[in-house]
Amino acid sequence: MVVSIECIPRTSFGRNSANVLRRSGFVPAVIYGKERENINVAISVRDVSKHFAVLSGSGVVELSCEGKVYKVVPKAYELHPVSSVVLHLDFVFAGEHASKFQVPLNFVNSGKSEAIRLGAMLNIVKRTVLVRCTAANLPKSIPVDIENAKVGDSIKFSDLVFPDGVVPLARDANSVVATVVGKKVKAGTVAATA
């Protein structure tokens, strides 16, 4: 489901005008494009708060501005260092050209993992992965199945499965994404606890 958000055009720029916008209840934002001119907009703080999970993620968003609808993908956001208020949003046009995106990793089946059930812990080293794809092929997350992981196992980038049209940009395929740590369990102990 694509989220649609209303925005207004920005005509003045710079720190002072951005602060005036923020005091008026808006967050400044920019839509970047390779073959298009950048578009400066502002989104209400209420809409940013309501849809922050989407705006900080990797899905397609529709920004409506004065009757025009722009399909965009969130690229980055800036938070205030103390209050964690959103100060600025960056988007890129959701075109047919491939772009780089940070996609979250989703660790699945931890409840089915025998090692986790017996007290081992999943040590997550990376929470996102850099990929190249079009906005149409951009996944919400990359699943990392840990059902068969045992104590001492390392899950690497080379173990991840990417959908068609999504190319991982990891510099080293042997980079570790997560490890399973804890005491090794003997075979007799597993039968006794079951």
From Swiss-Prot:
An example Gene Ontology molecular-function term: structural constituent of ribosome
SUPFAM superfamilies given in the database record: Ribosomal protein L25-like
This protein's record includes keyword Mitochondrion: no
UniProt KW keywords: Ribonucleoprotein, Ribosomal protein, RNA-binding, rRNA-binding
GO cellular component, one term: cytosolic large ribosomal subunit
CDD domains listed in its UniProt record: Ribosomal_L25_TL5_CTC
Pfam families noted in UniProt: Ribosomal_L25p, Ribosomal_TL5_C
A GO BP annotation: translation
InterPro entries: Rbsml_bL25/Gln-tRNA_synth_N, Ribosomal_bL25/Gln-tRNA_synth, Ribosomal_bL25_b-dom, Ribosomal_bL25_C, Ribosomal_bL25_long, Ribosomal_L25_dom, Ribosomal_uL5_bac-type
Keyword RNA-binding in annotation: yes
Function comment: This is one of the proteins that binds to the 5S RNA in the ribosome where it forms part of the central protuberance.
Subunit structure: Part of the 50S ribosomal subunit; part of the 5S rRNA/L5/L18/L25 subcomplex. Contacts the 5S rRNA. Binds to the 5S rRNA independently of L5 and L18.
Family per similarity comment: Belongs to the bacterial ribosomal protein bL25 family. CTC subfamily.
Protein name: Large ribosomal subunit protein bL25
Species of provenance: Neorickettsia sennetsu (strain ATCC VR-367 / Miyayama)
